[in-house]
Each structure stands twice: as structure tokens, then as C-alpha cells.
Amino acid sequence: MFPSRIPKARFLLATALLFTLGLSAETKHRRPAPPHHPKHTHHKMKNGNSVERRSDGRVSDVHNESRHMDVHHGLNGDRRVTAYRADHSRIVTERGRAGFVERPYSYHGHDYYHRTYYYHGRVYSHYYRGFYFHGVGLHVYVPGAYYSTGFYGWAYHPWHTHVIYRWGWYGHPWYVHYGYYFAPYPYYVGPSAWLTDYVISTQLQAAYDAGVAAGSAGPDAPVPSDGPALTPDVKDQLNQEIQFDIELENGEAALEASGQEGDPGSSGIARIFADSHPHVFVVGAPLDVVNEATEHDCALSEGDILQTTTAPGPDDKAATLTVLSSKGPTECAKDTAVSVTLDDLQEMQNSLRQTLHQGMDELQQNQGKDGLPQLPAAATAAPTPTAYAKLAPPPDPDAAAELQQQQTDADQSEKEVTTQEAQEPETPPAATQPAAPIERPR
């Protein structure tokens, strides 16, 4: 049921060699041109506004040039609004989910980004490093603080006993709702297994809360007779991915402690596609992807699991992954091959690492409680803030109000563009004249 542990020698070797890819490249924030879906119609107007519609006529994307605003309507009913501001910051909001204000800044001549998230009245910060991969500008997560080497070693290696832990969310509405999909391990052989359940449960709770806020949570489904859809085998693959990420963060922490900067090419998805091993991604936000067999949309949501198949080609802006688990008929089916943009994959990895770091915070703070083992003395030191986090621009004091206002502005923005779309029919391409016949010598 539980994965074999990666040998200690590999952990030490990987820590020493982790940042040798040499792939780093900076990226200034710029508005990406979204790829056009092969089955969608795209109507671009004279003033730069545009509307993209699905094959059934429903709007998927609206771009308002004068407002510098993009609105995306997901298949599952979610709406994401992104606004770009003159100072190169951006605001991103999603119905019922955490929104953020992102501001760029420079540290040691490199591009960094500070996101201030607002969720259920809480304010928290995350940090990112700019990086180009296959010509796509990515924002790669970098922790705002690192633990001691002793803590990462403890988090990586197994416990000396099986730990039975009772989660506080048993009986909560979200857990009842997703009982058909997820069940925690019956016991834990080490921190990475506990963190696996922490990551999945955190993502599912966020999805449920967003559904309740939008009035679209749906009825609870019965647990299948053969067990939850998220199988132990798939969870074990995620467990192994979490071990890799603990390994990764330990290497980053060593560089930070020595006054060096990490390489975003080693910390982001470039590293994942550089080796020959399959890797798994956890979907961290609602996402529409392309079913490669049908070229139609299908939806993914928090807690769905994807696996890499092959690395993208040098000119590819998306990668092919296989769906290992999803939540029923409204989403991409299990074993479906889907095309996912590199930017979306990087955001999935960012979400996993952010949630993983949050889980490590809880492990350290709750050591010795509810069955969790006590930490060794070498693992009890508080995380040390990074130099780049200390120099980040402060949170926007008006950001909470701006996030709320953006949802209202998006309503007006969409209305402006769709009204113009109706008044300005798309001009069909000019008919080409048939080529003159070629005179051949007699």
C-alpha cells in the first residue's frame, strides 16, 4: 500500500547535484497570448477586443483591450478574471477561491514576483522567480522561508513506527461530499504520506467551499463498493512526488544558507521534464484542457491527478499528460490523454509546493499532538526567511477591495465586448482568385 522509500544516499546526492541544469532565464511579466482551442471560434474586433466561443456557442474567453482585462469561463461554471496594470502588476480573482495581487520586483538583477493572496479574510504571501521554458514565461514558486537541514531530513525519511492520526475534518461536509473520491491512509509510515493526505484534503476542501459559494456544489455521491476513485496506487505516486519536492526544497535551502540563489530551471517544470521518470501533477485550480483524442474541452478541478507521458518538443507550448484520477462524468475521464499548457503545469507545481510547505508548517507546529511523533532537536528551529522575501514590495493595502471590485468590473467588461461582438460581425477572409493556368510549351 505504501511506496518504497528512496535511499538516504540518493537524498544526499540529489541535494548536492540538484541545481546543475543551468537552464535559468529571466522573464519580465507580460500578458500571454492564450492559445486558441482547435474547436473554438475566435472573433477579434478592430479595437483589439476579442471573444472566444466553444462549439456549442457558449463564451469561454473575453478580452477587453481598453480595460487590459481577460475573463475565462470554465466548463464547471467557474470564472477567472485577470487584469494587467500599468505598473506591471496584475490582479487575479476567481469566484469563491483565493484571489491575489502580484507585483514584480528585482533581486540581484533577477526578476521576482510577490503575490498577496486573500482568502476568507486571511492575507498571505507567496514568491516566484521568472523563467523562460520553451519560450513561455513562467513564474516558478520559491519559498519565503526555509527550514533547517534537520527538519528536511526528518520530513523525508520514514518514522520508526506506524502512526495512526485522526484528522479534524472527519464528518465535515466537504469530506462527506468527496467520500466517493478520497479516503486518507489508515496509518502513516512517514511524514511524506501524511503530507500526501494533507495536500489532497486541502485541495478538495477549497473546491467544495468554492462550489458552495457559487451554489454549484452538487449532491453528495455514494462511496463505490470498490473504494474511492483516488486509488492507493495513485496516492503512492503522489507520495513519491512529494518526497522529490522535499528533496528539492532541501537543496534550495542549502543554497540560500550559503548566500547563493537557486536556479528556477531546477526548481520548476523544466527539471520535471529533464529526467526520464514519470511525474504526477495535482490540479490546484479549475482548469479546461483539450482531450487529444476528440480535440474537445474537458474539465479538471482541485485534487485531480495527472501523469507525464513524454517531454514536450522544443517548440511545444503544451505537454501531453494522462489523467490518473478525476471526479466523474463532468470531468476528463480516467486514462484520457490531455494537452495542458506549460504555464498551467507550472501553476500546478506551484500550488503543490505551496500547499506542501503549509503542511510542513503544520507538522512542525503540531509535533507530539494527535499521534504525531515528537521532532528531534535538530528539526525544531523556526524557518528562516529568505533574503528575496525580505526585499519584496509590501502588500497593497487596498488589494482586498480591488479584488472585490474586479468581479464587478468584469461583468461590465464582458458586457462591453459581447455587445460589440454582436454589432461588429467578423469579416470573412477575402476570397482568393484562382491562379491563371500555366502555359506549357507545345
What is each stretch, according to the model?
Residues 1-101, 377-442:
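Extracytoplasmic low-complexity, disordered linker/stalk tracts in cell-surface/secreted proteins
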Residues 276, 301-304:
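Residue-level recognition of short, solvent-exposed, well-ordered loop/turn junctions
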Residues 304-333:
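SH3/SH3-like beta-barrel superfamily modules
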Residues 32, 36-42, 46, 52-236:
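Low-complexity segments
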Residues 291-302, 310:
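SH3/SH3-like (including bacterial SH3b) beta-barrel domains
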